[in-house]
Amino acid sequence: MDDKNLEIKVELNVDISCQSCVDSISKELREKLENTKLVEHDIPEQRIVLQGTDLTQDILETIKNTGRNATICGLSSTTTTTSTSPSSSTCHKKQETVSGSAVCSLGLIENWQKGCGGSGGVGSKGVYGVIRLLRASTTKTLFEGRITGLKPGKHSLVVHEFGNLMNGCDDLGEPFISNVENNNNNNNNNNNNNNNNNNNNNNNNNNNKNINKCKEILNKIIGTSDVKQDGKAEFRVLSDKYDFWDLIGRSIVLHSQDSKYSPIEDLNNNNNNKNIVNSESDKILGERVACGIISRAASIGQNHKKVCPCDGTTAI
């Protein structure tokens, strides 16, 4: 299983009223998206479920191009786990879908409440996007989405320790290291220290520590996109760096390795940050262009809301 071939299911609220509505959506999907198909629909509930490998943003825009209002209300993996029941004399196997979904809005969007379930983040003026997270298996997490309004150059997504947006992107801490990774790093450091006790090698040891620290920080990058003139960065990355449930409440930061941006703005336009380098990791990863809180989101069948609690808009 890799990031390009991993199929996911996407549930949407769509204003459909008859079978011809469903048929027109299916036709649009076949013509515009090669890797996504409609697999379920419920006309009375005005809900559809799609399955494929296209970006969720492309799916949403394709359906809206049919002239219908649409919102994503659930995301699920197609991966299943198998368990065996010991109570039966015969081997009874039960398959369960791996579940877990989250969303992170990076950048500024007008009239959205900061920190509200995947809604208002903070960022440089004009930069905005949504990254969706999906627990693809017991050990891997899918990060996918698009961020727009960027300057040409390399941009990287990185999970940071904290989810505090009060001071823009400045108080989000360092790149997050999971407990498993932290234990592994400690073991490696202990081994290195045991093998380097000669005082004459202090300079070499310091150089090695700096190199290892740099590699450690770069290893925290989820994915890197080389932004062109259209100003778009797209990501679809399957990562085994984190336990999915340990990501909720932390943050995702978009770092720019090439371009300088204007100061980050918050929703009240009163943030005086100068986008200064505020950590050692920023010297390696680059400027913090936009950020947002990772918020738990609904899996398929879990979200029955018709009105968004963040901005009060009607879903359909």
Swiss-Prot record:
Gene3D superfamilies: 3.30.70.100, Superoxide dismutase, copper/zinc binding domain (2.60.40.200)
Record note on cofactor: Binds 2 copper ions per subunit.
InterPro entries in UniProt: HMA_dom, HMA_dom_sf, SOD-like_Cu/Zn_dom_sf, SOD_Cu/Zn_/chaperone, SOD_Cu_Zn_dom
Residues engaged in binding Cu cation 2: C308, C310
Gene: ccs
Name of the protein in its database record: Probable copper chaperone for superoxide dismutase
SS bond list: C169-C291
Binding site for Cu cation 1: C18, C21
Family designation: In the C-terminal section; belongs to the Cu-Zn superoxide dismutase family.
Protein purpose: Delivers copper to copper zinc superoxide dismutases.
Annotated spans, Superoxide dismutase-like: 99-298
Names of the cofactor(s): Cu(2+)
Ranges for domain HMA: 7-71
One Gene Ontology CC term in the entry: cytosol
Keywords: Chaperone, Copper, Cytoplasm, Disulfide bond, Metal-binding
GO biological process terms held by the UniProt record: protein maturation; removal of superoxide radicals
PANTHER family in the record: SUPEROXIDE DISMUTASE CU-ZN -RELATED (PTHR10003)
Compositionally skewed regions (Low complexity) per UniProt: 182-210
GO MF term set: copper ion binding; superoxide dismutase copper chaperone activity
Main localization (coarse): cytoplasm
